[in-house]
Amino acid sequence: MAKKKSEEHSGADANDSDYTEEPNFDDPPNFVDNISDEDLLGDMLAQRPSEADGVESVVVVDNMPKVEPSRLEKLKSVINKLFSQCGEIVNVVYPVDEEGKTKGYAFMEYKTASQAEDAVKKLNNHRLDKNYTFAVNLFTDFQKYENIPEKWEPPTVQPFKVQSDLYNFINDPDAYDQYCVAAETAPNCVQVGFWQNTLPEPNELETRERFTDTFVKWSPLGTYVVTFHKPGVAIWGGSSFQKIQKFPHPGTQFVEFSPCENYLVTYGPTPTGQKIIIWDIRTGTEKRSFVGDGMSVLSMFRWSHDDKFVARMGENSIHIYETPSFYLLDLKSIKIPGIRGFSWSPTDNVIAYWVEEQNQIPARVTLMEIPKKRETRNKNLFHVADCKLHWQKSGDYLCVKVDRYSKLKKDKKELDVKFLGMFYNFEIFHMREKEIPVDSVEIRELILAFAWEPIGNKFSIIHGEPNSSNVSFYEVNKGVKPSLVKRLEKKSCTHLFWSPRGQFIVMANLTMGTFEFVDTTNDYIISASPDHFRASEVEWDPTGRYVVTGVSSWKVKEDTGFNMYTFQGRIIRRTILKNFVQFLWRPRPPTLLSEEKQKEIKKNLKKYYPVFEQKDRLRLTRASKELLEKRSQLRETFMEYRNKRIAEWKDQKSRRVMLRGHVDTDNLETDEVDEEVVEFLVKEEITLLE
């Protein structure tokens, strides 16, 4: 065996036998290595240079128009403009027949193979017009398809995987709602807990550490919860919140579900602006992508109530896409010069949009049916500075808040415009009535907030000065002008939160953390006025029975947590949670009962009262029994700990006596103790009396 010797002591040290022996890595004689190079060095061999055919960067475009030589240049211009978006085009060949007419396909060579793959991904099945849809393939795919074996072999049967029930949360016999609570445990590390709002104490369903990097969001029907991560986003669901699907979109900042949960829109930054991707939730495939400019494009896509259409606003136009193809409706945009905003009806395929004033032409609010593109109502408006569109949740009414001016002042270059003498109009469209009549309400004070009653015919506004504002409630009825039914004066509120079931409303000041609970059917009496200092959010549960106010660590760093109240403002519980971030009720899907069945249940509700009261008594009895058992168990645990410590204390008595000078201090009487009082000067003050 080889010996390791120091150069400094070679031949001079007699202790050669103390040198350490090197391990021998030689193979024994006749050794056969059973490990192949691919198994041992697979990752390195995958990177070794290989021969190339030189056609990896070539794509074949089929289903192109067959044109005469006179129209070929125009076709080339259109094709080059479209395909150059995927990379630099080196060469293009358009095969022609004997007469010089193109054959309907072309060969296109990109600078790199990755650009060719990107062209196939983005432009395959691209619809040029109603007659031509491109079929784009890599040139190398032809060789792959030529080598398909003639004998067909059936695919291997994959084992069936039972998917978790995504709707188990609505099967609870007592109809308890669920909610999630998020708290930041470390930078870019958020813990999320899922709870069931049982009585008397909530039941913890699941808690996930490092569940998301920033925050979470429920889907509109409560089926999924989405989490945010550096590579993209993921959706979770089922009884134990398993991962359902993931969507790779690095740096996603915001997501939006379609109303029926068929599609997901992700918004993420790019060097030039925002990239928006529309995904199919069930398959996880990308349906279409867009690149916005540097401006904020959050929620730039608006969905119809049935997921059949999605729309976005362009320059002097609205682009409406059909699903699932995501082609433009009728293959063209709707040209609307001067359009400034639009919104879908929450229950019908109707778009409302407004157009600004132009060249002495008044501003206009228009209702348009989709897909017919038929205008059903127009309303001209004069001296308009801005408009806001507010749909009632039931789709019965549309309110257009119009900011109007008495005088317009422009500078010399007309770059800076000032509006003087501002006042406000509310234009109410009665969507369910014949010819859609419009009523108008004028307010001469500053409007701070507006909110429709979700189920009903009332709306509320905050108007006046911010520090001493008024809250007015209006009622809308058929055939008459909207009437003022109640005005609450000198209220320092900033936001209005209606119950999802209507009738009750919370008037909130999210600056001071004050809240007022109002019953709009009982002479607008304020039932409670609780405080939650620094509260920044208000969340009604889907049934309208509970309200939660929260103090998020995004706003402040101390005293974070949430309070839960009844719909009348009675406090149920207070929860202090360090680094609390977010509280979200889980939405519920719409009921499957018909309106007639719901009316029947409401009519016979008194029959069910005894059953509900009995359940409440049993629940309270069970809760009291569980509480007593818990207290008894805690007492037994404490007594066991106490007896253990007393026995340990008795065993140490001899040691205590020895350490205390052989004096048993355990049994000292009070008369054997000397008490000494010491007084000393603490402070001296001199007060002059006049």
Swiss-Prot record:
UniProt-listed PROSITE patterns: RRM
Gene Ontology CC: eukaryotic 43S preinitiation complex; eukaryotic 48S preinitiation complex; eukaryotic translation initiation factor 3 complex
Biased composition (Acidic residues): 15-25
Keywords in alphabetical order: Coiled coil, Cytoplasm, Initiation factor, Protein biosynthesis, Repeat, RNA-binding, WD repeat
Any coiled-coil regions, as ranges: 614-645
Renumbered residue ranges of the record's region Disordered: 1-36
GO biological process: follicle cell of egg chamber development; formation of cytoplasmic translation initiation complex; regulation of translational initiation
Domain RRM: 57-141
Keyword hit for NADP: no
Matching Pfam families: eIF2A, RRM_1
CDD domains: RRM_eIF3B
Presence of the UniProt keyword DNA-binding in the record: no
Protein localization: Cytoplasm
Classification via InterPro entries: EIF3B, eIF3B_RRM, Nucleotide-bd_a/b_plait_sf, RBD_domain_sf, RRM_dom, TIF_beta_prop-like, WD40/YVTN_repeat-like_dom_sf
Top-level taxon of origin: Eukaryota
Primary location group: cytoplasm
Sequence ranges of the WD repeats: 207-246, 292-331, 334-369, 442-484, 530-575
Biased composition (Basic and acidic residues): 1-11
Entry's Gene Ontology molecular function annotations: RNA binding; translation initiation factor activity; translation initiation factor binding
Known function: RNA-binding component of the eukaryotic translation initiation factor 3 (eIF-3) complex, which is involved in protein synthesis of a specialized repertoire of mRNAs and, together with other initiation factors, stimulates binding of mRNA and methionyl-tRNAi to the 40S ribosome. The eIF-3 complex specifically targets and initiates translation of a subset of mRNAs involved in cell proliferation.
Similarity comment: Belongs to the eIF-3 subunit B family.
Summary of subunit composition and partner proteins: Component of the eukaryotic translation initiation factor 3 (eIF-3) complex. The eIF-3 complex interacts with pix. Interacts with mxt.
Name under which the protein is recorded: Eukaryotic translation initiation factor 3 subunit B
